Amino acid sequence: MNLHKLIFTNNACYKAGRKITPKGIMVHSTGANNPWLKRYVGPDDGLLGKNQYNNHWNQPMDREVCVHAFIGKLADGTVATYQTLPWDHRGWHAGGSANDTHISFEICEDDLTDADYLNKVYHEAVDLCVYLCGLYGLTEQDIICHCEGYDLGIASNHGDVLHWWPKHGKNMDTFRAAVKAKLGASAPDISVEPEQ
């Protein structure tokens, strides 16, 4: 996993300062054809690239949205994860009670047709979940997507990630199985950016 940290200290969610005890992980995807992390994560740290519209989420916004991490492309095209909230911070991601219990991350979508990109972000997400399970004593059974959260009555009505992954032969069951396999093996290879 290629993990970096750029905490959204200018987002109202961070400023609210509410904490949670993580009981699960919720997987989201952005719903927009833009695989670049710089669209959501900013300002540029030298790896992200410049967001020409300056519409990243690390600033005051007219919407209450914030997740704990994003997975997508850096400026050089490699896939990475950016932590954007402390893992035990209450996010604004589910539109329901999962905000009080779940760590959340968004996977930046492309046009949903690039199997190579999907495989890279999928495996990055598996490694992130293995890492978070290790930190909080969770298992693969504690991982759901936004769509499953809606079915459980703890999230708003969204289709992510089940509108995308099945196009490439993947779903939440294959994802949980991949996390379980890695939890049973050695720890994932994690490159973590040093604290600044």
Predicted regions and their residues:
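A cross-domain feature marking catalytic cores of carbohydrate-active enzymes
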Residues: S29, I71, I107, C145-C147
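Basic/polar, cationic surfaces and motifs that engage anionic cell-wall
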Residues: N2-I7, K15-K19, T101-I103, D110-Q196
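Catalytic nucleophile-His microenvironment captured as a short glycine-rich beta-strand/loop
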Residues: C66-K73, H102-I107, C133
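N-terminal catalytic cores of peptidoglycan-degrading enzymes
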Residues: M1-A98, L162, H168
